[in-house]
Amino acid sequence: MILQLKWESFYYNLKRDFKLFIFVWLYLNLLRVISLITMKSYAGDINLNDILLTIYYGARISLKTAGVLMLFTFIFVTLIGWLINKHLDKLRLGLSAVFLFILNFLFVAKYFYYREFHTNFNEMVFNAVNDDVKALFYTMIEQYHLLEGTVIIILFTAMVVYILKKYLAWQWIKKSFKFEKSLIFKISVIVFTLVFALFVRFGASFSYAKSIHWENCAKTKDTFLNEIILDDMQAIYRGYSIKKRIDNGVIYGVHKENIIQNVEFLAKNSDAYRLQKQDLSQIDSNLVYQAHGNIIDKKQHIFIIIGESFAQWPLLDEYANLQLGENVRAIMQKDNATYTHNFMPNGAFTPMAVNAIICGLSDVNIYPNHQYESYKQVYATSFAPQIKKIGYKTQFWYAGFSGWERIKDFALAQGFDEFHCASDYQYPSGNVWGCDDEFIFDKLKQEVAQNDEPTVYVILSVSNHAPYSVDLAKAGFPKEEVRAKLPADVQNNEDLLNKLGHYWYTDKVIGNFVEDIETTYPKENLFVITGDHADRTNIEAKPTLFNRYTVPCIIYGDGITKNILSDEVAGGHINIGATIFELIAPQGFEYYSLGKSLTRGANVGFNDSVWLNTVDIGKLDGNEPIEVEKTLEAYRTISWWRSIKGNLIP
């Protein structure tokens, strides 16, 4: 009898939790529609389909926000009801009132925030603690009428809570049924609740592969609509997540107390002293180089191709029999191609590679793409503004969505003329991260065909990434042939085969693109091919550090010879810009770079945890060779200082 009463209490409260969830979810979507209507002036050239996409994906991600409140009431009301069956409805209503007040407060605050920053809430909300908090508080009172606004929000929330109270008290079906007391029904209720929780957790999906979250929700071509897809709670969560990343900026090798010594070290390694531009009161002038004179003729097209998870190991001779990278290997072996095996990505994740290519800074876990300094002015080491001085336009092409890691905003802020991505087009196949790579490369070929101006194209692929959803059979992946060549202990590992197939697909797309461009525009192109990072897929359980972490660096084009890069060079992503300048810039051209050109003897590369030089590789554990230690400290300390504090050294 007691258990039956407890079940009835549990079931009663659980039904109200579900009713509360529906109310809050609908309310979140109502707020989103109001935002779309009242803030439409921020939108660009949009159509009905864009608006429907915004509402659809917004509704999905808001399931998570509504689920947060339901989780609280389930734990602190419904489960507690097994022990104390008093005032539970009031407790649920009280928790809901607090949650609704926060929603309403954020909804109003968003209008002011968006007007100021042209974005929904982000990490800058949490950076406010570094400001003069007292002055900030008074500004909010005087300029934004904080006190009066809060009173109005409280009154409005009270009205919403009153409606919620009536809604929760309303019984859809007043009659009880006998089957509700059966064991099968009780088990069914519990199972349904667990399945529903999973469905909400992944935003109207049952797996990560098809989930939606703040990192992949930029589904439209319009920045404003992408921001509105995030409800205000999700935007706050985005800001919190980014801030946590930034807070991890205390990283091995950063010694800001030694900033002068590190600047001087790089000034002596660059041409700053020879050009008499050294200045220890600031950073930029100490990073100047003077080009020795173009090694090859200036090209009409320069392509910097960054393959997602495009590791080096499948391109090595010891793995050639797998034929996973035959297209890129064929490029490497051409007479007019050169490469170095001693090459490291800038970090462990894609944003670090993007940051290195765009702004030329070493990774220190502070994400320059989210730093205020990156949007105040271009860095002296940024690639796009410098290559423009030689007569090139610049375009960034991404197979994903523009809102990912603020990639569009960052690229444009750092000097790129144009940005193109999956959001700009209707594409036939893809996943939560973007379109299949072949589509964006096809669009790029169309752009090249109609563009008569000398242009640098940076291309970032996306398909070789979870959830690994490319139709490999349709693409022609010889799965069974690869399986037969794998070590016996992994031949039945279907997940591994799928990942290897996506590497094969990336290689195929890159190879086909390079071949098509070369055939159509012979002798007019320079290609640089690399990967954003490795350390995702290997066929060994314990691969060597070299096979686990290194990425390729291949330079291909008319005029390139094998001996342009010697066997005694090593580097990483921050050396790419300088290398391109030395290849095509006229003698005497001045450029700014943290990393030295591979053609001028760069000899150190590292990511977040591993270093290499021309003869060895190892973990960053304090036992690095002295030249690695000094170079790493200088690169990282200056990158941290330049991103956080700016150019000047007090």
Regions found by a protein language model. Give the residues of each.
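Transmembrane and membrane-interface helices of multi-pass
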Residues: 2-250
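Intrinsic-disorder-associated interaction segments
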Residues: 3, 7, 11, 252-259, ...
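Generic alpha-helical secondary structure signal
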Residues: 8, 12, 49-50, 131-135, ...
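Residues that form generic nucleotide/phosphate-binding pockets
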Residues: 58, 62, 139, 162, ...
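Short alpha-helical "patches" and their helix-cap loops
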Residues: 91, 248-258, 370-375, 594-596
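Extended hydrophobic/aromatic-rich secondary-structure runs
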Residues: 139-142, 149-207, 267, 273, ...
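The feature marks either
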Residues: 221-225, 229-290, 298, 334, ...
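Solvent-exposed soluble domains appended to multi-pass membrane proteins
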Residues: 270-650
